Amino acid sequence: MVRPPCCDKGGVKKGPWTPEEDIILVTYIQEHGPGNWRAVPTNTGLLRCSKSCRLRWTNYLRPGIKRGNFTEHEEKMIVHLQALLGNRWAAIASYLPQRTDNDIKNYWNTHLKKKLNKVNQDSHQELDRSSLSSSPSSSSANSNSNISRGQWERRLQTDIHLAKKALSEALSPAVAPIITSTVTTTSSSAESRRSTSSASGFLRTQETSTTYASSTENIAKLLKGWVKNSPKTQNSADQIASTEVKEVIKSDDGKECAGAFQSFSEFDHSYQQAGVSPDHETKPDITGCCSNQSQWSLFEKWLFEDSGGQIGDILLDENTNFF
């Protein structure tokens, strides 16, 4: 059950307090102290309820109450506490001991609430305007950031390529001088082509003459061996030598060709002074065969007697092949 309010009792006075009532209440509280508000009306003889006595003391008669306008710090405290606690003005007044809960409530309803609503409306309008104005700027800022990031990535890639190139050059130090030498040779090759073209013919004739001199000496050595072996090889060698001599005569440099031909003619002259002829070349081979035949005469006689003259015919046929 809910307790009925004390103000509804018969004989209780309502309305504003008179100065005489204030003096009676203040003198009683100074003697007994604030508290036990139910006994105050009966003890003082006031025709007021206990609640009215408490509120009159707390909001108007107690010492240290600050009157007048609220400071900026007090306004911020009230706004912050009202957002946290709501309309609990007595709890809010406990954080501001110089202000009463009734004064805080009245000041909130008359000034702070309207002021706060106006500030919120202005802030919302500013936010809307800033959002509308910042939409193209934000897109441009994003595009600029993307462009700057792309440029930075390109720079990074180029720096990486340069670093790779420098690393490859550092790891292969022999490549750089080769490249420089090739560049210098290619630049100087165009200048030296004309000078080298004139000397190329002389070098070619010199090379052919030197190779021919060496080939004539080799042919002379081979001719000596061919003279001992068979006359057929000598004829073929003479033909080869004559054809090579003709080719040398057709060359450009006449002096070197004449010297080579002279060396070959001197070799031929020395060979003729030795008195060697194609008929005489095969005779030493026959004498060697005859000497070998005298050594094996006893064996041949025995074979001739045994085979009935067949060996003699074979030996005569073999000797005829040497002629």
UniProtKB/Swiss-Prot annotation:
Per the UniProt record, the source organism is: Arabidopsis thaliana
Q: In which tissues is it expressed?
A: Expressed in vascular tissues of leaves, hypocotyl and roots.
For this protein, the record's SUPFAM superfamilies field holds: Homeodomain-like
Name the residue ranges with Low complexity bias. Answer: 130-148, 182-200
Q: What is the effect of changing C49A?
A: No effect on DNA-binding. Loss of DNA-binding
- Mind telling me which Pfam families this protein's record contains? Myb_DNA-binding
Its cellular-component GO annotations read: nucleus
Modified after translation how? Ubiquitinated by MIEL1.
- Molecular function GO labels: DNA-binding transcription factor activity; sequence-specific double-stranded DNA binding; transcription cis-regulatory region binding
Q: Does the keyword Zinc apply?
A: no
Give the domain section of the comments.
Answer: The N-terminus (11-116) contains a fully active minimal DNA-binding domain.
Protein name, please? Answer: Transcription factor MYB30
- Record-level GO BP terms: negative regulation of photomorphogenesis; plant-type hypersensitive response; response to bacterium; response to high light intensity; response to hypoxia; very long-chain fatty acid biosynthetic process
Sites where S-nitrosocysteine occurs are at C49, C53
Start and end residues of each stretch annotated as Disordered? 119-151, 182-208
